[in-house]
Amino acid sequence: MTSEALGTSRIVQVGIVVADVEATARAWSQLLGLPMPEIRLTDEFDFARTEYQGAPTFARARMAFLSVGQVDFELLEPVGEPSTWNDQLQQHGPSMHHVAFEITGMGDKRAYLNDQGLKLIQSGEYVGGRYAYFDSQARLGVVLELLEQDRPAEGTDEATD
């Protein structure tokens, strides 16, 4: 069943904040019998334009993705500046951080969640799309993330562009 409010029922990601992304990725890989994922660093501020609590931040994270069925486990090791990832790690230790829904119409969905009393805590860009985290911990037990992927322009071949 599709959520009319978010326009999707597709959970695409479970985010886990960790102190050591390599060790945690190795442990998950061994447990699930999956290959060790690539560890990469999120984009720099000039591209990502990350905002935390309404202000620009140079926050980054070392990250790895493990695909399990149609859901990715996203492992995030905070690097540096203030972020929701740092807050989670400092307050709760390694723990589940977010559940992500893939959506279209980021502006409308952000406004809807704001109207529902959920405060935007962090947002940014990445190659191929954008994300927004909402402070839903007290109400839902987890941070809510919206992910919007860029769509290829009509009439273009995604494989060659």
Protein language model features and the residues they cover:
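Short, flexible, solvent-exposed loop/turn segments with mixed acidic/basic and small polar residues
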Residues: M1-L6, N86-H92
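Residues within well-ordered alpha-helices
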Residues: T24-A25, R62, K109
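Long, hydrophobic N-terminal alpha-helical segment
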Residues: M1-T50
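Vicinal oxygen chelate
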Residues: T2-A5, I11-A19, M63-D72, E74-E77, Q88-G105, G107-D161
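Short solvent-exposed loop/turn micro-motifs enriched in small/polar/acidic residues
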Residues: S9, T57-A59, E125-V127
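Conserved short beta-strand elements that form part of the metal-binding/catalytic scaffold
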Residues: L34-D87, R130-R151
